[in-house]
């Protein structure tokens, strides 16, 4: 596992921080995250991620403005440490990363060729950006 992380480090160090617009997850990872989200998250956050009485939305403007400029690492840490509400810290890092990949796909961030990592330091290099940067 350490070797995989070391092999990916140059990709993240090329030009500093990446954003959620840089294809930071794969379609396959998002597909794995979909049933995990349905099982672990949808009862509170709704099937369409629109939120519920006690749970905020995980899609759209409110979600994106709350996380804009923060890192995917911070988001994954929040998920890991506080969710599911009835059993925090019970899901693996891989499960949380797959759910986050699904969340990114529903928020219409593009998929890429490399899976969203589970390593916290690598995830801190990925910024959540609500607006697509101009090139």
Where are these regions (language model features)?
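Electrostatic cytochrome c docking/interface patches
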Residues: 14-36
């Amino acid at each position: 596992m350490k070797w995989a992380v070391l092999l990916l480090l140059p990709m993240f160090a090329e030009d500093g921080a990446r954003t959620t617009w840089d294809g930071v997850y794969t379609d396959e990872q998002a597909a794995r995250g979909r049933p995990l989200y349905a099982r672990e998250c949808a009862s509170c956050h709704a099937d369409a991620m629109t939120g519920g009485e006690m749970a905020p939305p995980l899609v759209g403007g409110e979600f994106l403005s709350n996380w804009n400029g923060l890192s995917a690492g911070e988001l994954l840490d929040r998920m890991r440490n506080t969710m599911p509400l009835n059993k925090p810290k019970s899901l693996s890092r891989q499960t949380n990363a797959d759910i986050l990949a699904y969340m990114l796909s529903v928020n219409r961030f593009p998929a890429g060729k490399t899976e969203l990592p589970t390593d916290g330091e690598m995830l801190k290099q990925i910024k959540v950006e609500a607006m697509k940067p101009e090139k």
